[in-house]
Swiss-Prot record:
Paired cysteines (S-S): none
GO BP term (any one): translation
Biological function: Not known. A homolog of ribosomal protein bL25, it is missing the N-terminal domain which binds 5S rRNA. In vitro does not bind 5S rRNA.
Coiled coil regions in record: none
InterPro entries: Ribosomal_bL25/Gln-tRNA_synth, Ribosomal_bL25_b-dom, Ribosomal_bL25_C, Ribosomal_bL25_long, Ribosomal_L25_dom, Ribosomal_uL5_bac-type
GO MF annotation terms: structural constituent of ribosome
Disordered: region residues: 131-151
GO cellular component, one term: cytosolic large ribosomal subunit
Name the record gives this protein: General stress protein CTC
């Protein structure tokens, strides 16, 4: 189970089907076979807090201008009724320019969900391209070499 994914499953208990949240899986020492599964029964739960993965879509304008896109957060903590828990939260980053950041406050939560993370927290950044310092160092070395040669 990848980190941050909220898996809802149906489990039969005493002949009754219940919606459960898969909380944890323990695997055997070879890592292939599950030996224990923790479920959280959501039958009588109105709302639950879960981490949901973020899916970034689009190419940021800043990347097209030579910048680098860097995701900072990969999940968001949301509070929602079990039936409204999304598999992922899709975030369009095509509007991010050079040197701009996307914050939690900029994300519209899915219907019925509330994002619990700090609104000021940075979700992703488009860094400006780094200036090439290598060319300047080579120029400086050439000048030094010329000075030594004439001495």
């Amino acid at each position: 189970m990848p980190h941050g994914e909220a898996f809802l499953i149906e489990a039969e208990l005493d002949g009754e089907t219940r919606v459960c949240l898969l909380k944890d899986i323990q695997f055997g020492w070879l890592g292939n076979n599950p030996i224990h599964i923790d479920l959280y029964d959501l039958s009588n739960v109105e709302e639950i807090e879960v981490e949901v993965p973020i899916e970034f879509v689009g190419t940021p304008a800043g990347v097209e201008a030579g910048g680098t896109f860097e995701p900072v957060m990969h999940t968001l903590t949301i509070k929602a009724p079990p039936a409204k828990i999304p598999e992922k939260i899709v975030v369009d980053v095509s509007g991010l320019g050079l040197g701009e950041a996307l914050h939690v406050r900029d994300i519209t939560p899915p219907e019925g969900c509330m994002i619990l993370d700090n609104p000021e927290e940075t979700v992703a950044v488009v860094y400006e391209p780094e200036e090439e310092v290598i060319g300047e160092e080579e120029t400086g070395a050439e000048e030094t070499g010329e000075t030594e040669a004439t001495s």
